[in-house]
From Swiss-Prot:
One GO biological process term: protein ubiquitination
An example Gene Ontology CC term for this record: endosome
Protein name per the record: E3 ubiquitin-protein ligase MARCHF3
Subunit structure: Interacts with MARCHF2 and STX6.
Ligand binding (Zn(2+) 2): C87, C89, C113, C116
S-S pairs: none
Catalytic activity: S-ubiquitinyl-[E2 ubiquitin-conjugating enzyme]-L-cysteine + [acceptor protein]-L-lysine = [E2 ubiquitin-conjugating enzyme]-L-cysteine + N(6)-ubiquitinyl-[acceptor protein]-L-lysine
Binding site for Zn(2+) 1: C71, C74, H97, C100
Pathway membership, UniProt: Protein modification; protein ubiquitination
């Protein structure tokens, strides 16, 4: 094992002045206590006279909060809801609340863990149409939906009454042998209903597309996992202690 001349003072980067040496990683346990806390020092020998990396990690004093695992999303413990370990993540990232995970999977529209890429067994249920009508999405989509609904409720009876009056007038003109006026009124009625149906169809297709997209990305996710993945309360403190010890031994290059 080859190392350069490096100082071992905690929280101070070593001063290395040795010549070029092959890259060698060394991890030392100084065995000393500073303020009652053990210090873990990692050194990497110099290459071409330059220090590659040095990490000093302090193992924090054990506390009741460090001994208990917590949800990696909300950072809360198991006082309100049991913690699960449904994927292959370990340590402090391996525990999570069921409700937090279901909410995250619903918001991200995914079915796998973003860290270990473990695919969860989930059941997706579409949300009802009433919920979309209450909250269709962004503000401009709300205004568009509200405006089109008002226009539809206002234009539909207006177009119906106008078409009926035009047809009634065309029939009266036919009785009085005024064919030109009757043809004009019939053409006006056809144009009126064509424009109305075209606008209704375009608006309906637009909002159906928004609803289908909202329904696809806002599904209710139910996590299908066995009860065996729940972390018993009598093992939570032991799990937290092991995770703290394991994290204290990690080093960074």
């Amino acid at each position: 094992m080859t190392t350069s001349r490096c100082s071992h003072l905690p929280e101070v980067l070593p001063d290395c002045t040795s010549s070029a040496a092959p890259v060698v990683k060394t991890v030392e346990d100084c065995g000393s206590l500073v303020n009652g806390q053990p210090q873990y020092v990692m050194q990497v020998s110099a290459k071409d006279g330059q220090l590659l990396s040095t990490v000093v990690r302090t193992l924090a004093t054990q506390s009741p909060f460090n001994d208990r695992p917590m949800c990696r999303i909300c950072h809360e413990g198991s006082s309100q809801e049991d913690l699960l370990s449904p994927c292959e993540c370990t340590g402090t990232l391996g525990t999570i609340h069921r409700s937090c995970l279901e909410h995250w999977l619903s918001s991200s529209n995914t079915s796998y863990c973003e860290l270990c890429h473990f695919r969860f067994a989930v059941e997706r249920k579409p949300r009802p149409l009433v919920e979309w009508l209450r909250n269709p999405g962004p503000q401009h989509e709300k205004r568009t939906l509200f405006g089109d609904m008002v226009c539809f409720l206002f234009i539909t009876p207006l177009a119906t009454i106008s078409g009926w009056l035009c047809l009634r007038g065309a029939v009266d003109h036919l009785h009085f042998s005024s064919r030109l006026e009757a043809v004009g009124l019939i053409a006006l009625t056809v144009a009126l209903f064509t424009i109305y149906l075209f606008w209704t169809l375009v608006s309906f297709r637009y909002h159906c597309r928004l609803y289908n997209e909202w329904r696809r990305t806002n599904q209710r996710v139910i996590l299908l996992i066995p009860k065996s993945v729940n972390i018993p309360s009598n093992q939570q403190s032991l799990l937290g202690l092991h995770s703290v010890k394991r994290n204290s031994k990690e080093t960074i290059v």
